[in-house]
Amino acid sequence: MERKILNRYPLGNTKRVWKQKDFILSSFQGKGKNLRNAVMNWKESGLTCVELGWASHEEAWTVANLCEEIGLDLIFQDFSEFGGMQEWHREDVRSETMAKDIADKIRPYKRTIGYYVWDEPFKDDQLEETRRQIDMIEAEDPERLGFTVAIPSYNGIYTWENGEFPAYLRRFADIIEPAILSLDYYPIGIECWEKEGQLDNSRMWLDLEMMRIICREKKLPLWFYFQSYDLHKRGSGFIFPMARMMMYAACLYGAKALQNFTAPSSITNMDGDKGQYFDEFKVINREFNMLGNTLMALDSKFVFHSDDLLTQTMETYKEGMPTDKICDSTVLDGTLPKRTSVGELHDEYGNKYLFVLNRDYEKENEIKLSFKGEKRVYVVDRNDGEQKLMKENCSELVLKLCAGDAILVRVQDAGEEAFAIEYKLEA
């Protein structure tokens, strides 16, 4: 079977210098009593990047040196010198001179790809200060990312219930003009999560849809922080398939980075040793490292959900409610079974992919997809990233997906010439 080599290109806000070349698997915070062990374990687990949110001076420079030595990318923050978190912030970066001092310190660190400037700015003065600091740092060090992350809709001020979250997220993107759009959402154990209902009525889906809309409008890569442990301590009975489902869910919406909150509570423990989900994350991180090259070439075209998603709604949810209908797809037909979601993603050459997700994080789900016409289906193999023929001349596809799992397939008309695709980064 012929293999076509298709170019893909770096992604990012055209108003910023920094561009994303590869799929990123990162984690918030560099914590651990033995930081050398921690960084080595994060590297072994398949993470490609560490983020130093809220880092002390000692932690920041210790981890920066270890990442340089061990070979792990870093988004740097030394809270004693710059940056902020919501309303609490440092005001030390007041001038271009101070920004230059920080950039000069970082310049020798080749594995440091960016600066963690602000965690969850939400008021307008915080958004403006975040923009100011990113602009100053970019002027001194334009090849590195000025990173910030938006606050989720359960923040208590800008919510879906009062109708103010969509406007907040737009202001975040318009005022800051970030190189990428990142959002965190940790749904297990908070309101709209239910033991029986799982995440069927979680506003996480509204936040993801709002992100997708803005990323499409501004041509921004979508980054998503997912929950990887029992953060809220409310008897959720947190299990790894919950994290797996959230990781795959973000990719239905076109995510180009998955941000673990947090590796020191899931991949490692606070001593820096291997943690409760080390083995599980090592497997799934390897899978995403194999899928990542293809995912970087794809844009989210549609996201379809079974009709049991978001059955409890309000008028103020309207802007984030799923509007894509299977009848709009040129690939899918019919309806989706319970707790099933499908992202339809296209590359710039017109090739079409389906990311099929079992949203049920407690049990296996048999998923039957119906196609419009006869199709040829290729699986994007999670072991090596290659496209392999899965089924020919089919009008339907039956999949068995374990709890919270997903599969990425490419679909073409059966009458077309068969070929696999490999994407090549054209810098």
Report each predicted region and the residues it spans:
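Glycan-processing catalytic domains of CAZymes
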Residues: 1-374, 379-420, 426-427
